[in-house]
């Protein structure tokens, strides 16, 4: 029995110590630092708004795309159901998926004859991208204006208000947050 304890005691103590350090202490420290340094992002970047009854309602996250399909809304990138897309860009399956999405856009807005921006017919790498390009937002302005009975100028102003610039002024492209635009559109008095 003594030999058994000599062998297993260090293993059990090591297991418990590593579990405590790696499972409690380290995540706790990282959570505290993240909460202090990035207060809004550490808790999911949840968007909250005051409701008519005075309570606060949660509408979603600034960092996770939501599906909008009604014509009066700005519609984001094609969702891939929360999973990354692994399709080869030149595969037949990808081609059929893009053609299906193009047909959906033409059915949604048959009067729009412009070329559909690529990000509206392809899914992002994460499958839950909350932003679209300025071109993708501009493609939808006339439809949103018509469906909501508001001027295109108003729609463009709302889109511009929720467009983020390039990172550090030169990295990447400006993007438009779909959820923020739709919340702003819904807040308009009609």
Curated annotation (Swiss-Prot):
Positions of transmembrane segments: 13-33
Pfam family, one: KdpC
Main location (coarse class): membrane
Record keywords: ATP-binding, Cell membrane, Ion transport, Membrane, Nucleotide-binding, Potassium, Potassium transport, Transmembrane, Transmembrane helix, Transport
GO molecular function, one term: P-type potassium transmembrane transporter activity
InterPro entries (alphabetical): KdpC (IPR003820)
GO cellular component: plasma membrane
Family: Belongs to the KdpC family.
Complex and partners: The system is composed of three essential subunits: KdpA, KdpB and KdpC.
Name of this chain's protein: Potassium-transporting ATPase KdpC subunit
């Amino acid at each position: 029995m003594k030999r058994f304890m000599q062998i297993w005691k260090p293993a059990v103590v090591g297991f418990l110590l590593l579990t405590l350090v790696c499972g409690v202490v380290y995540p706790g420290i990282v959570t505290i630092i993240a909460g202090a340094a990035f207060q809004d992002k550490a808790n999911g970047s949840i968007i909250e708004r005051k409701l008519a009854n005075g309570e606060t309602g949660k509408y979603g996250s600034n960092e996770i795309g939501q599906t909008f399909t009604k014509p009066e809304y700005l519609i984001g990138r094609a969702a891939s159901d929360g999973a990354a897309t692994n399709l080869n860009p030149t595969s037949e399956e990808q081609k059929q998926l893009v053609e299906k999405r193009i047909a959906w856009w033409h059915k949604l807005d048959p009067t729009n004859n412009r070329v559909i921006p690529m990000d509206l017919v392809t899914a992002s790498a994460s499958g839950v991208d909350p932003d679209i390009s300025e071109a993708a937002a501009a493609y939808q302005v006339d439809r949103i204006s018509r469906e909501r009975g508001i001027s295109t100028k108003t729609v463009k102003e709302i889109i511009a208000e929720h467009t983020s610039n390039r990172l550090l002024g030169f990295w990447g492209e400006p993007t438009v947050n779909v959820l923020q635009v739709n919340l702003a559109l819904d807040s308009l008095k009609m």
